[in-house]
A protein has these predicted regions:
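Active-site proximal helix-loop segment of RNase H-like, two-metal nucleases, encompassing DDE(D)
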Residues: 298-302, 306-329
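Short, positively charged, Gly/Tyr-enriched micro-motifs
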Residues: 4, 28-198, 203-209
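Active-site beta-loop-alpha junctions of metal-dependent nucleic acid enzymes
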Residues: 178-179, 229-254
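C-terminal domain-tail junction helix/linker
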Residues: 323-382
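Short, flexible loop/turn motifs enriched in small residues
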Residues: 208-214, 221, 225
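Acidic/histidine-rich, metal-coordinating catalytic segments
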Residues: 255-270, 291, 359
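RNase H-like polynucleotidyl transferase catalytic core
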Residues: 280-308
Length: 382
């Protein structure tokens, strides 16, 4: 019978003459082999290249990796033949070197919905902006110096006193920033735009409590707006997948659509896209990899401009994080990142477009930075 449409044998005929290795179905046109591998194994998954059963190789809390162990697999032979002479010598010295990954692998993820939540500022803060003794204008001034100008809390305190005669402690500045971020975050998540056909993703470094952490961004290539963001302590699959969910929404909501994600060589993006597309009739997100600073292939040449967008976004983000010389808590880093995204999308005029990536009607005609923050806080609280 036909492997694809299950048509009886009388509808199959030899398609390669005397070799008698290939049959063609008259009903659906499917090409099959006369001696196909019968899947009598009780294995959970099979190799798509050689049809041999996949063996469970590694298991972690988030995923199980299955591996094709066959040395006759076409995928393995193709990867092996592509090795350079130097790589072949090194591999003979260490056959099980994990850097080559010649055998086909499949990952089964065990992620729960709570694992796919992006990190956001804590809802409970030390102050309630509706009950503070200072005016909202002072809060707007604090956010202008702290976010727009990228100054530290202590320098913000000093400038408020030296220029306007406003006496605040640096802790009060931090409290206002955290409270504003907690108030803006829900509004921001509800109004993040969905990426268009082409978007770029990247992760950048951030020091929190003297340890490396990572900020993830997804930016649309047309509007230049940030469509998704996240913070994590690893560059693993879970935060990458959570960022994709934050930007694109659930996979079921995108059935029948096609998106292209331009990213670097971080393997977490490949795994995250595979997990996102799992269970869908057709893949929703396909990736284009741009590595290094030079265009060494046609893909890099075509998609380099899109990758440059997220690189420039990271540079703008670093302008705001570098004066802090590291953050004392992940919640503080999340608060700063949330306010940066709000500033980048709604308040910062993009030099190439001569306007902000996203527009809010209530912000139109307001040129004063403190007043813009006051208005944005009022919109978020509504």
């Amino acid at each position: 019978r036909c492997e694809k449409c299950n048509a009886p044998a009388e509808y199959l005929y030899l398609n390669d003459g005397k070799k008698a290795n290939q049959v063609l179905c008259k009903i659906c046109g499917h090409l099959g082999t006369t001696e196909r591998v019968r899947r009598q194994s009780q294995a959970k998954y099979f190799c798509p290249h050689c049809s041999k059963p996949l063996s469970q190789w590694k298991t972690s809390s988030t995923e199980t990796i299955y591996k094709c162990m066959s040395n006759d697999c076409p995928h393995y032979l193709k990867k092996k033949s592509a090795l350079t002479p130097e790589e072949q010598v090194k591999r003979k010295q260490q056959k099980f070197d994990p850097n080559y990954k010649l055998h086909y692998q499949y990952r089964e993820y065990h992620l729960k919905p709570e694992d796919l939540k992006c990190h956001r500022p804590a809802c409970k803060t030390k102050v309630d902006l509706s009950k503070i003794h200072n005016s909202y204008h002072i809060v707007g001034l604090v956010l202008t110096f702290f976010v727009n100008a990228g100054l530290s809390s202590r320098l913000t305190r000093d400038l408020l006193k030296g220029i306007f005669g406003i006496k605040l402690s640096h802790q009060t500045v931090i409290n206002y920033v955290n409270a504003a971020a907690a108030q803006i975050a829900p509004f921001l998540d509800c109004n993040l735009p969905k990426p268009g056909k082409i978007a770029a993703a990247d992760e950048t470094y951030l020091i929190v409590e003297n340890e490396w952490h990572y900020t993830w961004f997804v930016i649309d290539s047309v509007t230049k707006a940030i469509c998704g963001y996240n913070l994590s302590d690893t560059r693993g699959v879970a935060p990458a997948l959570a960022t994709l969910y934050n930007a694109y929404g659930t996979p079921d909501s995108n059935k029948g659509k096609q998106f292209t994600l331009v990213r670097d060589g971080c393997p977490s993006y490949d795994s995250a896209m595979m997990a996102y597309n799992h269970g869908l009739p057709e893949p929703v997100i396909s990736g284009q990899k741009v590595i290094g600073l030079e265009n060494l292939d046609e893909v890099s040449k075509e998609y380099r401009p899109h990758k440059q967008l997220v690189e420039r976004l990271n540079r703008s983000y670093k302008f705001h994080t570098r004066p802090r010389a590291g953050m004392k808590s992940l919640n503080g880093a999340s608060a700063l990142t949330t306010l940066f995204v709000a500033y980048y999308n709604y308040l910062r005029v993009h030099s190439g477009m001569k306007h902000t990536p996203l527009k809010l009607e209530k912000l139109q005609g307001i040129s004063s930075y403190p007043k813009q923050w006051e208005t944005l806080l009022a919109i978020s609280a509504a």
